[in-house]
């Protein structure tokens, strides 16, 4: 989103600075923890949603695009934390919310969105699809306002049911303070930040993950692609080199460790090193957020011979670390062994920063890690994935790339295992 919009007085936590940012982040992190973030409660919620997702996936006998179902599942986890409820996948308001989020993510990552970010005063007067960003944004604000109004009607002060109630309690406590950072517009924008940051990025990671597994079935089940099939991924020049003694494949590992009689849990992650490595390598390779959000230096700074005056806007390019051959062998290749040691145990890498780093890293990083792992492992436990074209013909070139990398549209078949 343009800095001209996001730096407005009613901006939420994502683009705030100084004491305002610290105040909003402290409340938001506290409220999210109170609502179960990082606890068994939120894990149970994700496991339940993963089961609901698989039930929906299993109803598709013909090839289908998984985008909507994956967005539904991911967003429902956010809805449970923020609004205290989940939606039916057929709910029209829920569908509208997700369509607006998806449309804005694509628009902001388009050439039109990037042009607006660079020349907002000019692009304000230029007709084009970028103008739809602001219309969508107002519809999203109206959706959130409606939920807040319903909460105000039903809440009990001091007995928060969800994030919105926690924020409303704080607004009530500081209503006499003219300098308070807690007011209705900051609640609306912070809620919008949580939805925007926690829905499209996670669902795009899952969509890209399934697409990669369709292209390389040997990763999933151990069955190789057709003999002599090229390893290159058209458009990105990526390939998949396997060592001669490759680790157990994902479904084999899940079957051995988890079995078929219960759902995967976070406690299984340490016992699924290859699966965990595949999840990390998917995130590294596709780089759903290749750049971090714009930041500003708070004082005059000298960096590698360059002088950055106070207030200079900077944008970290995290994808540069993911393509660094010092950090990752064959960085243009999809290779899960980037996250495995010589004995096949999982190995972390400090250059892996899908949720940014430092004090301003993604608020929902822990939640996103849980969702990506549990959704993917549950899907692979329950289904065999089948592409609608030859694996070697699958193209991983992003549909759009700028703020975010979006996977190209595709269809797949799922067969119960």
Question: What residue spans do the PLM features occupy?
Answer:
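Cytochrome P450 substrate-recognition site 1
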Residues: 1-42, 70-77, 93-122, 398, ...
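Cytochrome P450 catalytic-core helices
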Residues: 201-219, 234-243, 251-253, 366-381
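Conserved cytochrome P450 K-helix E-x-x-R motif and the immediately C-terminal K′/meander segment
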Residues: 139-142, 242, 247, 263-305, ...
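Conserved cytochrome P450 catalytic core segment spanning the I/J/K helices
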Residues: 33-37, 110, 135-206, 228-239, ...
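Cytochrome P450 heme-thiolate "Cys pocket" and heme-binding signature region
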Residues: 304, 342-372, 397-399
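Cytochrome P450
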Residues: 36-48, 57-80, 88-96, 119-143, ...
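Cytochrome P450 heme-binding "Cys pocket" and the immediately downstream C-terminal segment
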Residues: 246, 365-403
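Conserved cytochrome P450 K-helix/beta-meander segment immediately N-terminal to the heme-binding cysteine loop
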Residues: 221, 269, 316-343
